[in-house]
Amino acid sequence: GCKGKYEECTRDSDCCDEKNRSGRKLRCLTQCDEGGCLKYRQCLFYGGLQ
């Protein structure tokens, strides 16, 4: 099956084909903050340009 939000992934196609209320689609992304980036990628709703 597909992977939902915050689930570990390797590519965009791993993520479920769903949108949030803002119309953002799930993409396989690396979460980063001031401390650096996670070692793995997760399915997250991406609001950037397609």
UniProtKB/Swiss-Prot annotation:
PTM: Contains 4 disulfide bonds.
Keywords: Disulfide bond, Ion channel impairing toxin, Nematocyst, Neurotoxin, Potassium channel impairing toxin, Secreted, Toxin, Voltage-gated potassium channel impairing toxin
GO molecular function, one term: toxin activity
Cellular localisation: Secreted; Nematocyst
Cellular component terms (Gene Ontology): extracellular region; nematocyst
Predominant location category: secreted
A single BP term in Gene Ontology: envenomation resulting in negative regulation of voltage-gated potassium channel activity in another organism
Keyword presence, NAD: no
Family: Belongs to the sea anemone type 5 potassium channel toxin family.
Note in the entry: Negative results: has no activity on voltage-gated potassium channels rKv1.4/KCNA4, rKv1.5/KCNA5, rKv2.1/KCNB1, rKv3.1/KCNC1, rKv4.1/KCND1, rKv4.3/KCND3 channels, hERG/KCNH2, voltage-gated sodium channels rNav1.2/SCN2A, rNav1.4/SCN4A, and cockroach BgNav1.1.
Function text: Inhibits voltage-gated potassium channels (Kv1/KCNA). Is potent on Drosophila Shaker IR channels (IC(50)=94.25 nM), and rKv1.2/KCNA2 (IC(50)=172.59 nM), and moderately active on hKv1.3/KCNA3 (IC(50)=1006.48 nM), rKv1.6/KCNA6 (IC(50)=2245.93 nM), and Kv1.1/KCNA1 (IC(50) around 3 uM). In vivo, induces a rapid increase in swimming speed on zebrafish larvae, as well as death which occurs between 2 and 18 hours later. Also paralyzes swimming crabs (C.danae) when injected at the junction between the body and the walking leg.
Protein name stated in the entry: Kappa-actitoxin-Bcs4a
